[in-house]
Every structure is written in C-alpha cells, then in structure tokens.
From Swiss-Prot:
Region (Disordered): 28-63
Family classification: Belongs to the OXA1/ALB3/YidC family. Type 1 subfamily.
Comp. bias intervals (Low complexity): 32-45
Chain intervals with Polar residues compositional bias: 54-63
Subcellular location: Cell inner membrane
Membrane association type: Multi-pass membrane protein
Gene3D superfamilies, A to Z: 2.70.98.90
Domain of life: Bacteria
Keywords, in A-Z order: Cell inner membrane, Cell membrane, Chaperone, Membrane, Protein transport, Transmembrane, Transmembrane helix, Transport
Job of this protein: Required for the insertion and/or proper folding and/or complex formation of integral membrane proteins into the membrane. Involved in integration of membrane proteins that insert both dependently and independently of the Sec translocase complex, as well as at least some lipoproteins. Aids folding of multispanning membrane proteins.
Principal cellular location given in the protein's record: membrane
Protein name per UniProt: Membrane protein insertase YidC
C-alpha cells in the first residue's frame, strides 16, 4: 500500500465531505428567582402616543363586573436587551426588537425584530380557547402601563377579557436581564355548560432567514423524550405542517442564530406548527376541564431572542438543547468556548480564530512531525518500490506482499502520513458548525475594510469573503504545501494531488470567511513546520 495513495484517498474523502456540505447542507415549573419585581401600576405615566385610556383599574377575574374595553392600546416594555410592544386586545405581541442585534452589517441597520412584517396577522402570543381566537372576540382591558426595566428587575402587565362566556386573565412577567417572558393564565367558565375544553398558547413570526438560504433555514423545532426534532422543508410546513402530542418540553421557530420558543407548563400537549402566508406559526394546545364557576390556572413561558446558551439555560424545559451542532456537537461546543475565551482578551473574533488555530496546531505538532517523518521515509523507498512494480507487473497480490515486507524491514508505516489529516477533519467540521451556528460570530468582523481602501472586506466572519481573497490565498498555500510534500512515484497520483487545491478553493469560495481564515492559517503553519522538518533532514 503506497503512503501517497492513502493521503490521496483521505484528501478525496475530505473533498467529498466538503462537497456534500456545500451541495446538500443539513436539513435539520421553575421556581421564581429572588428578584425585585416591578409591577406596573395603573397610575404610571403612559406615553402620549399610546391610544386609549391611561389606566384601567380592572376587577378580579372572579368578579361579574363588566370589563372596560381598551381595544387597540399599545403598551411598551423596554429593557437593556429588547424593546417590545404588546397590544391590549388579547395581549398580542406586535413587535420584539433585539437591541444588541442588527438586521445587517450596515451602520444604519434597524434592530432585528423577532415578529416582523405581517406576522401580527397571525397573532403572536395569541391565546386560543376552544378554537376561538380570544384576541378577536369579546371585550379586553389591561392593568398597568409602559414598563422600563433595568438590572435584574421584573415587570408585569395584566390583560383581562370576557370571551364567549369565559373570564380570562393573562399575567405576563418580563425579565430585564433575559429574553424570557413568563405567563400565568386564569380562566373561569361563567356561562357555558361544564365540560372539557382546549387552550392553546401560540406564537408566530416572519421567516428568520431568506427562503433560499440552504445553510441557515428557518425551522420549526421541538424537544420531547426522543430528543430534538426539526423540520425546515417549506413544502412540508406549508402543505401539512407538523404535529406532536405528549410530553413536549418546548416548541420553537428558529434559525442558526435566533429562536422564538414557547415552553408549556402542562405535562401533555399537542404541538402544531405550520407555514401560512410566509408566516411561521406554532401552538401548544392542552385539554382543560372547564367546570362552571371554577377557576383554572395554566402557565407558559416564552423566549424570543438569540441562540445564547447561557440565557437559554435559565429557561425551563431544557431550551438550551435547541443549540445543536449535530454529529460534531462534542467538538463544536468546546471550540465555541475556546473562541469566546480568546475573544475576551482580543476583542476580535478573527484574531481569536488565528490563536485557536495556533493552539490546535501545537496540539497536533507531534503527530504532524511523525507524519512528515513517515513521508520522508516513504520518499526514500520510492526507488525500491519502483523496482518491485517493474518486477511483478500486473501481479498485484505478489506486489502488495513484497511492499508490506519492505515497509516492515524499514519500519515504515504507510498510513502514518495521513493521520494528522484524519484527526483534523472532525476539528474542521466542528469549527464549521460553530461558525455557522454561534450567534456571537454573526456580524463579527475581522478586518472590516480592505487595507488602504473603504471597500468592505471581512466584516462578517459567518459570511463568505465578498472579495474571495482569503479562499484564493488559502488555495495558494495549499498548492505550495503540495509542492513541498514528497512526491509520489505514480505520475497520475501527482497530477490529482496538485489538482486538489483548485477543488478546495472552489468549494471554499462560499464558506464562512472565519472558516477560510482558520484553514489558511493552518496551511501557513503547516508549511512552516514542513520547512523546519526538511531543513533538519538536510542537516
């Protein structure tokens, strides 16, 4: 077995894996913290732009008094993390803008809105009772006013409504230091016959990504006893949607970077998800016994924000499991931690990637040393191997037998040269997954402008290099590395090996620039190591 053939096989396998990723990307009760709560009082000031009454002192849900209508009143919630607008008619979420995330890298870009255009038509955070859209029926009022939360404070808004003989109270609690919203619902059957009914908590949003984005699709996901389940096929979501019954810890609409999740408080629900008019909708429905004049209490939590593991870990239902890197999860997550550690000292993710590359190279240095040594030994055996090929001709069995004896005699491992490459493949794909699925790297720049120009260059390490400079340089370094590698005796193998840099360059054109920077720097370090090895051999 020829060492160069093994390396060629590994390189081609690597190219196939990269090509596959390029052409077919993957389709994939909590105790309240001891915090100071700010419950908005009816006499708090309300912005003059908000229509409707300044305050409504509403009766207790158990009361038979009529509720004063406050239809159309828009209440705002301001925290350091987001700005939300809640409509008093049913407690609908009109907008939820993330203050720390921009829609694009442009300086005047608006904040990311987790609701988006036209999604209000599908009633985000709408409550459905026995199939009735509660926000579109009955009379609603509210208690409280605009909230402005800082530190670790909590704030509460209360919405009460009479809908088809039911008295409903929705109590929404907002967290200043998280994107979490906790909801407690009380329902009293005032005039309907006793019996079983249904309540569904819902949310909806526009597509979080471009419809044709294969690498970062908008998905409907849920987590049950079997683990994480995802559906991103738009045809499936439009035509039939998805349904899951039983113990569903949470359901969500998400992308690589953002998520809208609802976490039902019930042990058993029916989760439904669908794409309607380009709006993604999910609902978690549960059965409830509505005996007349008996109060029923229900609960649900929402999270509308970035895929931030630390913040999501504070949400019930193991929501942090939504961050999943697939097969390479065990590698990608430590790489994310390492990148974050380097970033806290460099304040630049590009530099953090370079430092991480150096650390990885140092860890692989002994193996690479053995690899280059093995390749040099194989190079010295080439004349003897050529004689064996000439001697045995087409007798492959005899040729292989004598070659194995030759390797044994000179203590050479024919597969030794490919070991570092094999070990780097999972690291490569782990970093690929990390760059594509870590919100901290979204819009993270390295060299914002091309030096000495005002041309935007590496302004987003999660996106491709718009000028294609780094993949071309990466290909050039790979070509140089091939030229320095001891050549194979087979001319055909030599030609294929020299052609590989062109194949890799083509595939890397649309890869995240952060990943290209990693591979380019890795090539440069490999060239330096190989040069040192060659110099030592000559000496």
């Amino acid at each position: 077995m020829d060492n160069k053939r093994v390396i060629l096989a590994v390189a081609l396998s690597f190219a196939v894996l990269l090509g596959w990723q390029f052409l077919f990307p993957p389709q994939p009760q909590q105790p309240a913290p001891a915090q100071q709560e700010q419950t908005a009082q009816p006499n708090q000031a309300v912005d003059s732009s908000v229509a409707g009454p300044v305050s409504n002192q509403l009766p207790d849900p158990a009361s038979t008094s009529a509720i004063v209508s406050a239809k159309g009143t828009r209440l705002t919630v301001e925290t350091p993390l987001y700005s939300a607008v809640i409509n008093s008619q049913g407690g609908l979420l009109e907008s939820f803008k993330l203050k720390k995330f921009k829609a694009t890298i442009d300086a005047d870009s608006p904040d990311v809105d987790m609701v988006g255009t036209n999604a209000l038509d599908k009633a985000p955070m709408g409550l459905i009772l026995n199939g009735i859209a509660t926000w579109a029926n009955g009379v609603w009022g509210y208690e409280g006013a605009n909230l402005n939360l800082e530190g670790d404070k909590l704030g509460t808004l209360i919405f009460r409504g009479d809908v088809e003989g039911f008295r409903i109270e929705r109590r929404l609690t907002f967290h200043a230091d998280n994107y979490l919203i906790d909801e407690d619902v009380r329902v009293i059957n005032k005039s309907n016959p006793s019996g079983m009914g249904r309540i569904a908590f819902t949310t909806a949003t526009k597509s979080l990504t471009a419809a044709d984005d294969r690498y970062n699709p908008t998905r409907i996901a849920w987590f049950n006893a079997e683990g994480l389940v995802e559906e991103s096929d738009r045809d499936t979501l439009s035509e039939t949607g998805v349904t899951e019954s039983g113990k569903v810890e949470w359901a969500a609409i998400d992308s690589n970077y953002f998520i809208l999740a609802l976490v039902p408080g019930a042990d058993s629900v029916t989760m439904k998800g669908k794409l309607q008019d380009d709006i993604f909708r999910i609902a978690a429905e549960q059965n409830v016994s509505f005996d007349k004049d008996i109060e029923r209490k229900l609960a649900c939590s929402y999270y509308f924000g970035p895929m931030d593991a630390q913040l999501m870990a504070k949400v019930p239902g193991e929501l942090s499991k939504a961050i999943d890197f697939g097969w390479f999860d065990i590698i990608a997550k430590p790489l994310v931690v390492a990148l974050e550690w380097f970033h806290q000292y460099t304040n630049n993710y590009g530099i953090a990637i370079i430092l991480l590359t150096i650390v990885i190279k140092i860890l692989f240095w002994p193996l690479s040393h053995k690899s280059y040594k093995s390749m040099e030994q194989m190079k010295r055996l080439q004349p003897m191997m050529a004689k064996l090929r000439e001697k045995h001709g087409d007798d492959r069995e005899a040729l292989n037998k004598e070659m194995m004896q030759l390797y044994k005699t000179y203590n050479v491992n024919p597969a030794g040269g490919c070991l570092p490459m094999l070990l780097q493949i999972p690291v490569f794909f782990g970093l690929y997954k990390a760059l594509m699925g870590t919100v901290a790297l979204r819009h993270a720049d390295f060299v914002h402008f091309l030096p000495f120009t005002d041309i935007v260059w590496l302004a987003d390490l999660s996106a491709k290099d718009p000028l294609y400079i780094t993949p071309i340089v990466m290909g050039a370094t790979m070509f140089l590395q091939q030229k320095m590698t001891p050549s194979a005796g087979d001319p055909t193998q030599q030609k294929i090996m020299m052609f590989l840099p062109l194949v890799f360059t083509f595939m890397f054109l649309n890869f995240p620039s952060g990943l290209v920077v990693y591979w380019m720097v890795n090539n440069v370090l490999s060239i330096a190591q190989q040069w040192m090895m060659m110099r030592n051999v000559k000496n």
